[in-house]
Regions:
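C-terminal ends and interior cores of transmembrane alpha-helices
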Residues: 64-87, 277-289
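Cytoplasmic helix-loop-helix junction between adjacent transmembrane helices
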Residues: 97-136
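Short amphipathic helix-loop junctions that connect adjacent transmembrane helices
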Residues: 12-27, 221-239
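Juxtamembrane intracellular "pre-TM" segments in multi-pass secondary transporters
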Residues: 178-206
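C-terminal transmembrane helical hairpin of 12-TM major facilitator-type secondary transporters
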Residues: 267-312
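Helix-to-loop junctions at the C-terminal end of transmembrane segments
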Residues: 42-55, 254-267, 351
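Transmembrane alpha-helices of Major Facilitator/SLC transporters
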Residues: 37-41, 240-263
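Hydrophobic core of transmembrane alpha-helices in multi-pass small-molecule transporters
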Residues: 82-107, 293-307
């Protein structure tokens, strides 16, 4: 919940904040894209480490890394707003700070997912992952609301709040979360190392990557779309972007506490339904010229995200052994980050050509992934 709220705070204010310090659209989106690549590379290593040393210390490490990284990232923009840093030097400093943060904060997601898998029976795995997703969704709902309120005190206020929240979560985990036992150390040459090409999970991992290529493309150009179409200033853009993200997160939350807890479908069925909802949402966003219609599109996106990601996590967890839970959780956690590498860059470049091309790009990605999954099921 803490990381979900923190990330939604960043996404809500980064576009207007970047424009305040005269960074271009491609520079702003590339900060997310390149740091996401770092996140993707680091996540599997943290997942495997949690298999050996236990989940709790890795979760705490990730939360503390998020705290320190956010403070450094915020300080860079504070210096930029003061006029001390500008241009390429400011961009490089912000990129370095975000990448450093990504190396350590990537520890939290795989270790948390593996902890949930360790403590749930196979027949309840999809529901358990949905509950974990619900906690993240609650943070994502609250984040934009908090961001909009705090933005009245300045664009940096939400980031300081995110750092405080992550530090509080680390303290809570340290005090309250039961320890998980260390596993016996296996010699390096005998360790089974899961790869993205593993036949048991590769279709699920590819789906997750495609899903977030499309979603991140929309998310990272949303602030530009609102600011340009509604002619907003920086603070207004942060508030409206936060509201749009809150709509998406609200639908994610609702579908995870209702549909996914009541319907007994296979993970693959949930994934296909979710992709169809996201395709509708992206298509609506491509033609949206006022906020109510845009909110409808974001609602469809949130519904799709709520159906797909817990199902991907559950399907991957069920496909591997107990000794591989941390490893597969690390791979699944890396997939959104990989999507955030390509999505913002492609959508940011297309947005500069025409604003509608960004959501159309995302719709095309959702359609392609859906078609490939349907064809795979028919084989």
């Amino acid at each position: 919940m803490a990381t979900g709220m923190g990330q939604s705070l960043v996404f809500a204010i980064l576009a207007p904040l970047g424009r305040e310090v005269a960074l271009g659209e491609l520079q702003i989106t590339s900060i997310i894209a390149i740091s996401a690549l770092v996140f993707a590379l680091a996540s599997p290593h943290w997942g495997r480490l949690s298999d050996r040393v236990g989940r709790k210390p890795i979760i705490i490490t990730g939360l503390l890394g998020y705290t320190v990284g956010t403070l450094v990232f915020t300080s860079v923009f504070s210096i930029g707003l003061a006029g001390v840093l500008s241009g390429t030097l400011l961009y490089a400093a912000a990129l370095l700070a975000r990448c450093g943060q990504s190396v350590v904060m990537s520890a939290t997601n795989p270790s948390t997912t593996a902890y949930a898998a360790d403590n749930s029976a196979a027949e309840h795995r999809t529901r358990t992952m949905a509950r974990l997703g619900t906690a993240n969704s609650m943070g994502t709902i609250l984040g934009p609301a908090v961001s909009g309120a705090l933005a009245t005190f300045g664009l940096l206020a939400p980031l300081y709040f995110a750092a405080t929240l992550a530090a509080s979560a680390a303290l809570l985990v340290w005090r309250q979360l039961p320890k998980t036992p260390r596993r016996e150390r296996v010699p390096r040459h005998l360790r089974i190392r899961l790869r993205f090409t593993d036949r048991r999970v590769r279709h699920l991992l590819a789906t997750a990557v495609g899903l977030f290529v499309g979603f991140s493309g929309i998310q990272q150009t949303l602030g530009f779309t609102l600011q340009d179409k509604l002619e907003l200033n920086g603070i207004q853009t942060a508030q409206m972007t936060g509201a749009a993200l809150m709509v998406s997160a609200l639908f994610t939350f609702l579908v995870q506490i209702t549909v996914m807890q009541r319907l007994k479908l296979e993970p693959g069925q949930f994934i296909r339904l979710g992709l169809l909802a996201m395709l509708f949402g992206a298509t609506i966003l491509a033609s949206a010229d006022h906020f109510p219609l845009l909110a409808v599109g974001m609602g469809f996106l949130g519904t799709g995200l709520g159906l797909t990601m817990p199902s991907i996590s559950a399907g991957a967890s069920l496909a591997v052994s107990a000794d591989e839970q941390g490893s597969v959780a690390g791979l699944v956690a890396a997939c959104p980050a990989i999507g955030f590498v390509a999505g913002p860059l492609c959508a940011g470049a297309l947005y500069q050509v025409h604003p509608s091309l960004a959501p159309l790009f995302s719709a095309s990605v959702f359609f392609l992934v859906l078609v490939l999954l349907v064809l795979r099921e028919r084989r």
